[in-house]
Regions:
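Radical SAM enzyme [4Fe-4S]-AdoMet core and its adjacent flexible, acidic
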Residues: 1-83, 89-93, 105, 109
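Amphipathic, alpha-helical segments enriched in basic
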Residues: 56, 65, 69-74, 85, ...
């Protein structure tokens, strides 16, 4: 991809809405974790030979590594949810929404580009602002809660109709975090080779 000028990409998993909400098959998180490890090793090896301006990166992997090594994450992986505060999405018709994953959900509309709209703030969507690891029963006792990047409120909103369930990738997080820690500890991958997207 770098040969074509693409340096940042996303290995996007499914958001549980539409047809993806019908879970006829279980996701094989072990195989998914193997794939993430392979991608991380590829990125590491590529970037090791490249100059920093030519580095490639994948959003979820770089965020997991930053979470482990720096204890930081970007807007889509933070708690409380930053939707409507630090991020806004614009639909094709000019409607504003708290998040690109919530476009079309009237509960999360902020108005329109041509009309009145809510000013982005933590108070714009109290339910999203109140959703944090400490308010989700399963998450508040999880040993991975401070490193887990799977905190997207839209995932649980579409899957359960509320904001107070663990993310559908909770099990994946429990698998991938120790694997990436092992890769970092053994120096198979180096955190400095994974810039944030």
């Amino acid at each position: 991809m770098a040969l074509y000028g693409v340096r940042k990409f996303v290995f996007n998993t499914l958001l549980n809405t539409g047809k993806a909400k019908i879970q006829e098959e279980e996701i094989d998180f072990e195989t998914l974790a193997d794939t993430y490890v392979q991608i991380a090793c590829y990125i590491n090896d590529y970037n090791k030979e490249a100059s920093p301006e030519d580095f490639i990166t994948e959003r979820s992997i770089s965020t997991i590594i930053a979470s482990i090594t720096l204890h930081i994450s970007n807007v889509c992986y933070c708690t409380p949810c930053a939707a409507g505060k630090s991020t806004v999405a614009i639909d094709t018709n000019g409607e504003l929404y708290a998040c690109d994953c919530l476009v079309g959900e009237k509960e999360f509309t902020m108005g329109t580009l041509k009309g009145e709209y809510k000013i982005p703030s933590i108070h714009a969507f109290p339910k999203l602002a109140e959703r944090k690891n400490e308010t989700i029963q399963h998450c508040k006792t999880c040993i991975w809660r401070s490193l887990c990047i799977y905190k997207c409120a839209a995932d649980t909103y579409f899957l359960y109709g509320d904001l107070y369930h663990p993310h559908s990738y909770c099990r994946f997080s429990q698998i991938i975090l120790p694997r990436f820690m092992e890769l970092l500890d053994s120096h198979r991958i180096e955190a400095c080779l994974f810039p944030m997207c």
